[in-house]
Swiss-Prot record:
One Gene Ontology term, aspect cellular component: cytoplasm
Protein name: Small ribosomal subunit protein uS19
Family annotation (InterPro entries): Ribosomal_uS19 (IPR002222), Ribosomal_uS19_bac-type (IPR005732), Ribosomal_uS19_CS (IPR020934), Ribosomal_uS19_SF (IPR023575)
Gene Ontology MF annotations: rRNA binding; structural constituent of ribosome
Family recorded in the similarity comment: Belongs to the universal ribosomal protein uS19 family.
Pfam hit, one: Ribosomal_S19
Keyword Ribosomal protein recorded: yes
Species name: Paracoccus denitrificans (strain Pd 1222)
GO biological process: ribosomal small subunit assembly; translation
Alphabetized UniProt keyword annotations: Ribonucleoprotein, Ribosomal protein, RNA-binding, rRNA-binding
Xref: SUPFAM superfamilies: Ribosomal protein S19
């Protein structure tokens, strides 16, 4: 079920504070965040966030198309290695 419109988008308070501080300083450093559940807002465009995937921070450069999505969508938590090959089929 989607979030109701009257509530507005959810963003952790510390993410807003870090983004505001980065905007004021003008530095282009990676902003490390652990909040994968936070929504990407228009004021985040142009900033680079390091989104934690459980092991390391994946750098995510925010663009216009990402607005309204969640940070977690751009930092995969699982590695796909492909399906195991059929050993019987290889021998023939």
């Amino acid at each position: 079920m989607a979030r109701s419109v009257w509530k507005g988008p959810f963003v952790d308070a510390y993410v807003l504070r870090k983004a505001e501080k980065a905007r004021e300083s003008g530095k282009s450093d990676v902003i490390k965040i652990w909040s994968r559940r936070s929504t990407i807002l228009p004021q985040f465009v142009g900033l680079t966030f390091g989104v934690y995937n459980g092991q390391k921070h994946i750098p995510v450069s925010v663009t216009e198309e990402m607005i309204g999505q969640k940070f977690g969508e751009y930092s995969p938590t699982r590695t796909y290695y492909g399906h195991a090959a059929d050993k019987k089929a290889k021998r023939k």
